[in-house]
Amino acid sequence: ANIKSQIKRNRQNEKRRLRNRVFSGRARTYVKRARTALDGGNLDEARLATQVAISELDHAAEKGVLHRNNAARRKSRLMKRLNALEKQAA
């Protein structure tokens, strides 16, 4: 690009892309851990992992990396599985 404003936009976009990758990557990692814990069947571990995953999803939504409805849907699905596990354990 030879236009000053476009050079600046490219620079900003790259910075934001890298920042967004961090938030989405963290959210993805913790959601995976929560799913693994839920599949494992250990209730305490599953509760803790789900709590951390929900926190990360909220953070990503707050930063604008995920849409808030997307984050809400993912949290809902995790909680649904956790509640099913708790019901099964009781």
Regions found by a protein language model. Name each.
Residues 1-90:
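Ribosome large-subunit tunnel/peptidyl-transferase-proximal elements
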